[in-house]
Amino acid sequence: MRLLAQHSAGFDPGEPWLEGDVSTRRDSHLFTQMVARRTSPHTGREHSFYRLQGPDWVNVIAFTKELELLVVEQYRHGINEATLEIPGGCCDPGETPLDSAKRELVEESGFATDTWISLGSCTPNPATQTNRAHTFLALECEAKAGLCLDAA
């Protein structure tokens, strides 16, 4: 396999844009919408760019000792239906991604483990969001507690 990178119009896409004023447009429970004025290093023109600042989140791919994959069914208001998904959620302030993953696994499934492997992180929507998604593999999970879902 070979990586083929294409640059638009001969410009260096890694060349930083000069950032001007940044202001908050709207602050909500989960995200803060920001607008940043930036100047193109190629044309010198100024543009507005919108971004959502929010907490990092975690995804947990969890298996029991019997190699059963743990999934949770949750109602999701964004799509107005129930989904079947792996445990996960937002990192709380001051919490490491691993601590968030451990907490979310117990909260959403009642299972816990001491065997954790980080599978890395990514920027799930770098065009408009500033946060990262961290994915963990949890092995040999055992039932430890009842569900402790976030209050809603």
Language-model features: locations:
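A short coil-to-beta-strand element that immediately follows conserved catalytic motifs
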Residues: 112-119
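Short, conserved, surface-exposed binding loops centered on an aromatic residue
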Residues: 61, 110, 125-128
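Conserved Nudix-box catalytic region and its N-terminal flanking loop in Nudix hydrolases
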Residues: 2-6, 15, 52-55, 59-103, ...
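Short, solvent-exposed loop/turn elements at beta->coil junctions and helix N-caps
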Residues: 22-24, 120-125
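Conserved active-site beta-strand-loop modules that form the wall/rim of enzyme catalytic pockets
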Residues: 68-69, 116, 133-135
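Active-site-adjacent beta-strand/loop module that shapes the phosphate/pyrophosphate-binding cleft
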Residues: 34-42, 125-145
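N-terminal presequences and immediately downstream first alpha-helices
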Residues: 1-34
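Acidic, metal-coordinating catalytic segment for phosphate/diphosphate chemistry
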Residues: 21-59, 65
